[in-house]
Amino acid sequence: MLPRTKYNRFRNDSVTSVDDLLHSLSVSGGGGKVSAARATPAAAPYLVSGEALRKAPDDGPGSLGHLLHKVSHLKLSSSGLRGLSSAARERAGARLSGSCSAPSLAAPDGSAPSAPRAPAMSAARKGRPGDEPLPRPPRGAPHASDQVLGPGVTYVVKYLGCIEVLRSMRSLDFSTRTQITREAISRVCEAVPGAKGAFKKRKPPSKMLSSILGKSNLQFAGMSISLTISTASLNLRTPDSKQIIANHHMRSISFASGGDPDTTDYVAYVAKDPVNRRACHILECCDGLAQDVIGSIGQAFELRFKQYLQCPTKIPALHDRMQSLDEPWTEEEGDGSDHPYYNSIPSKMPPPGGFLDTRLKPRPHAPDTAQFAGKEQTYYQGRHLGDTFGEDWQQTPLRQGSSDIYSTPEGKLHVAPTGEAPTYVNTQQIPPQAWPAAVSSAESSPRKDLFDMKPFEDALKNQPLGPVLSKAASVECISPVSPRAPDAKMLEELQAETWYQGEMSRKEAEGLLEKDGDFLVRKSTTNPGSFVLTGMHNGQAKHLLLVDPEGTIRTKDRVFDSISHLINHHLESSLPIVSAGSELCLQQPVERKQ
């Protein structure tokens, strides 16, 4: 065995010939002999072209460039890399051929070049699909937009539970949010039997994380569920019984994370609901499914924001959209004698022209949600309407003063009677010409956090208020969660019940209640197609909407076939209807007067 020649920068290249160099390479590669004479590919592991034997005119003797120039023209054959896999063989050939600045030429002896070997190698790779994973769809758009905008994308995942988050995620930076989700994943994995631990050796949590994370809810831990992601909500339900475990509107989701290197099989998102308040929900997504799930959630957020930009609707005030979840969102409040908004800023003066001139300006005007104070205030069971992000860019009736703004005839709300509509002296109107520039800057601005909702606030602050849309004007921007009209079968079934009063106002219904346990079901006068359960508990009247925007009759715990099924179930079993921490017991039905 010949000793391998070492390269020395002080060595004169004229001492060592090219044959010695190729001989040392052949000994280290496969033991075959290399010569400039005619040779077959099977006998020589390296084929040397004629250009490789020529000396580059620019490279002086003994230079490193001269050596690299010769080695770069060496072509690999399959015999020298027999022990490597197909993928490693391809990478090695690409690296060696890629280092050459000039194209490789065929050997002058007529031997076949290595280029025709590429199809054989690719065919071998096709025959061995286990060498490389199958290609995945791009992260930006993993599914068709119509599917996410419509019924949604469904995944079968494992629900591990949730942990209460005691602080608003909006008040924390991106790094802290990520630490919270990682800590929540670790705690749930340790508490759920059979769950794969996210971290084998986990450091004890810091005091800050311990103060942010609260109690855990493991009621449905370890259950296989169907996760449906759409622009409307994230719906978690059992595949067999279709029992709803959680249904979080996109506006109630403040942060989502998943597919990190150390938590590759887990997705965590923070959302608000009336059962768990603000909580971090953990999903186990095996076989690389976490990347697809988190990509679909991000796509739903992006499409939802684009939908809002294309079809902006009435925008509630910021302090209305940021009300606390602690308020009982499923219950109605009493009528206010005075308007809740009263401009009492001492240093502000009304604009010239007085109150009437301000209202009669031709500029577009959208009445505030509190303008309808005193009318019926309706909430959806199992839906959270008091969160950070209101239903700003979907045509859903947001009930704060409980009047459906899309059921009001067009033109009647442009000029309100004197003394009813509030006027503001500190408003600022942005010209319509400035709106496209604001939208383009918001889209082009870099966002480190994919689920950071700050662009929504910026768009809301810069969005000019448009006129109130009627039903005829809102056909082009139909909401996927708009209330459905009741069918004839439901109305016929309700007419047979003695506790159904028909169409009745809130005030009239409260007048029929005398003691705790009295209840009735009525058809709302301000919200067409809505049915309200009115009952008395602890001497106070409560009003609950029985049908959600999708037309499902449900409470937060169960889905029912009809309104009669819901009422009779709670009446016969004496089970209270729980909503936002309070209870409503159905004991004595208020019968309809004939």
Swiss-Prot record:
Matching Pfam families: PID, SH2
Q: Where is the composition biased (Low complexity)?
A: 101-124
Q: Which PROSITE patterns does this UniProt record tie to the protein?
A: PID, SH2
What SUPFAM superfamilies does the record point to? PH domain-like, SH2 domain
Q: Where is this region: CH1?
A: 335-498
Domain PID as annotated: residue spans: 149-334
What's any one GO cellular component for it? plasma membrane
Any one Gene Ontology biological process term?
central nervous system development
Q: Does the keyword Lyase apply?
A: no
Tissue specificity: Mainly expressed in brain. Hardly detectable in other tissues, except in pancreas. Highly expressed in the cerebral cortex, frontal and temporal lobes, occipital pole, hippocampus, caudate nucleus and amygdala. Expressed at low level in the cerebellum, medulla and spinal cord.
Tell whether Phosphoprotein is among the UniProt keywords: yes
Q: Where is the SH2 domain?
A: 499-590
Per UniProt, which keywords does this protein have?
Phosphoprotein, SH2 domain
Q: How is it modified after translation?
A: Tyrosine phosphorylated.
Q: Name the InterPro entries for this protein.
A: CEP152/SHC-Transforming, PH-like_dom_sf, PID_Shc-like, PTB/PI_dom, SH2, SH2_dom_sf, SHC_SH2
Compositionally biased tracts (Polar residues): 393-405
- PANTHER family attached here? SHC TRANSFORMING PROTEIN (PTHR10337), SHC-TRANSFORMING PROTEIN 3 (PTHR10337:SF4)
Its assembly, as annotated, is: Interacts with the Trk receptors in a phosphotyrosine-dependent manner. Once activated, binds to GRB2. Interacts with activated EGF receptors.
**What is the name of the protein in this document?**
SHC-transforming protein 3
Species: Homo sapiens
Please name the gene that encodes this protein.
SHC3
